């Protein structure tokens, strides 16, 4: 078949070209976006892969680094543990030494406490003994004074009872005499009253009979008048009668009360008379007692004056003693202050010197006795001698300082020993310096060396030592061929001597 020919392209219009251009731009833009998305996705994948690889590598590095760090840290920890173990051992040693020193201090403190306790108990026993003696003396004095007071009381009581019995008998006799006088006077009064009563009775009867006869008529007339007056009076004074009856009743009551009061007055008069008698008796007794009291008062005044004089003397003595005591107490306080300051200084020095103590001194701070058996026997013989009480008290006061003086004497001996050793070393040092100087002078040449005598210095076979005469220089040397003695010198080098000495 014949090929179909291509249709000829028709020319595009502007709009179609514009549309085609826009489609092309869109296709290019879409391709660019797709390419960008692919590139972005590739970069993201690559970044994720790199991050994954970096994390793996980091984990590997961290694992290996941890191993290295563990090893380094292990070595450091081993070193630290060794250092800490050494420090711990050193601290333990220090603590052990501190514990030992504290144990020794505790033992010393316990010994000092036991010693102080023994001293305190001994002092308490002495005080108790002294108090018992004082109480026994006071009890004896009290019993003696009680016995004296009892005797005085019994004597005074007996005298008072005797005086009381005498007064009772006297009052009884007086009472009996007064009663007898009263009975006699009463009997006489009754007889006189009876005679007077009879006389008056007879006289009254006679007068009554005469008056009856004389007054019968008058009475009748008066009776009539009285009846009239009575009637008039009764009528006029009925109210007054009632008031009179009331007053009469009151008068009876008052009379009864007066009678009762009279009886009371009589009883009171009797009591007053009895009390007057008692007052007289008591006044006599009181006068006697007042006289005794006056005498006692005079004695008390005399004793009071004596006591005032004694009190004045005692006050003067006490003031003088107080002044002396004040002066002595001030001096004692100053001395004690100095002692306390000295003790504090000793304690401070002891604390400073404690770190310089050796192990032996820390273990055995108090040395044992260094006396020989013979010296120990002499000390025992001297201690067996009689000791006075004052010396015993002084020894008891200074017994607590025994350990202190032991250490003090030990240190004093060590100081003396070190001073002696120092003098020896100074002597040796001076000798060595002298020998060294001689040696240096022998090997060196100077004006000072040339001016001194030196057996080692020889110039042109000549020494600067003076030549001795033959008789003095050759006392026992060998004789020469001509009969003269030859001079012999022993020369020893100073360095050789110094090496042997050092």
Swiss-Prot record:
Top-level taxonomic group:
Eukaryota
Quick one: a GO cellular component term?
motile cilium
GO BP terms: namely: axonemal dynein complex assembly; cilium assembly; cilium-dependent cell motility; regulation of cilium movement
| Xref: InterPro entries | DRC1/2_N (IPR039505), DRC1/DRC2 (IPR039750)
- The yes or no answer to whether the keyword Cytoplasm is present is yes
| Principal location listed in the UniProt entry | cytoplasm
Q: Which UniProt keywords apply?
A: Cell projection, Cilium, Coiled coil, Cytoplasm, Cytoskeleton, Flagellum
Q: Which residues form a coiled coil?
A: 96-160, 252-285
Family named by the database record = Belongs to the DRC2 family.
Quaternary data: Component of the nexin-dynein regulatory complex (N-DRC). Interacts with DRC1.
State the protein's purpose: Component of the nexin-dynein regulatory complex (N-DRC), a key regulator of ciliary/flagellar motility which maintains the alignment and integrity of the distal axoneme and regulates microtubule sliding in motile axonemes. Plays a critical role in the assembly of N-DRC and also stabilizes the assembly of multiple inner dynein arms and radial spokes. Coassembles with DRC1 to form a central scaffold needed for assembly of the N-DRC and its attachment to the outer doublet microtubules.
Q: What is this protein called?
A: Dynein regulatory complex subunit 2
């Amino acid at each position: 078949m014949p090929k179909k020919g291509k249709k000829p392209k028709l020319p595009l219009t502007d709009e179609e070209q514009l549309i085609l251009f826009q489609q092309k731009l869109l296709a290019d833009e879409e391709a660019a976006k797709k390419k960008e998305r692919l590139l972005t996705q590739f970069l993201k994948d690559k970044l994720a892969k790199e991050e994954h690889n970096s994390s793996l590598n980091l984990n590997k590095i961290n694992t290996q680094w941890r191993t290295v760090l563990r090893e380094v840290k292990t070595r450091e920890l081993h070193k630290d543990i060794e250092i800490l173990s050494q420090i711990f051992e050193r601290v333990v040693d220090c603590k052990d030494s501190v514990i030992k020193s504290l144990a020794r201090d505790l033992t010393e403190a316990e010994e000092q406490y036991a010693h102080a306790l023994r001293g305190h108990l001994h002092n308490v026993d002495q005080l108790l003994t002294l108090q018992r003696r004082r109480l026994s003396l006071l009890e004896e004095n009290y019993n003696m004074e009680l016995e004296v007071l009892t005797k005085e009381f019994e004597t005074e009581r007996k005298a008072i009872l005797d005086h009381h019995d005498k007064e009772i008998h006297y009052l009884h006799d007086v009472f009996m005499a007064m009663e007898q006088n009263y009975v006699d006077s009463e009997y006489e009064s009754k007889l006189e009253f009876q005679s007077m009563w009879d006389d008056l009775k007879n006289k009254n009867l006679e007068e009554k009979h005469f008056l009856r006869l004389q007054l019968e008529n008058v009475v009748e007339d008066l009776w009539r008048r009285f009846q009239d007056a009575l009637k008039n009076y009764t009528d006029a004074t009925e109210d007054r009668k009632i008031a009179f009856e009331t007053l009469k009743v009151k008068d009876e009551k008052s009379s009864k009360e007066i009678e009762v009061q009279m009886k009371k007055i009589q009883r009171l008069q009797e009591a007053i008379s009895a009390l007057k008698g008692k007052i007289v008796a008591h006044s006599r007794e009181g006068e006697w007692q007042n006289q005794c009291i006056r005498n006692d008062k005079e004695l008390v005044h005399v004793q009071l004056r004596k006591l005032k004089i004694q009190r004045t003397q005692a006050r003067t003595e006490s003031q003088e003693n107080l002044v002396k005591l004040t002066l002595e107490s001030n001096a004692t306080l100053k001395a004690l202050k100095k002692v306390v300051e000295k003790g504090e200084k000793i304690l401070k020095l002891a604390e400073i010197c404690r770190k310089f103590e050796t192990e032996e001194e820390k273990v055995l701070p108090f040395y044992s006795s260094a006396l020989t058996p013979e010296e120990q026997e002499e000390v025992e013989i001297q201690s067996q001698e009689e000791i006075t009480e004052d010396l015993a008290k002084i020894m008891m006061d200074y017994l607590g300082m025994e350990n202190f003086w032991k250490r003090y004497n030990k240190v004093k001996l060590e100081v003396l020993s070190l001073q002696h050793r120092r003098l020896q070393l100074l002597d040796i040092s001076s000798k060595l310096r002298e020998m060294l100087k001689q040696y240096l002078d022998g090997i060196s040449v100077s004006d000072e060396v040339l001016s001194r005598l030196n057996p080692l210095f020889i110039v042109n076979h000549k020494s600067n030592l003076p030549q001795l005469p033959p008789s003095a220089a050759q006392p026992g040397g060998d004789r020469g061929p001509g009969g003269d003695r030859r001079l012999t010198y022993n020369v020893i080098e100073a360095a050789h001597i110094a090496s042997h000495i050092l």
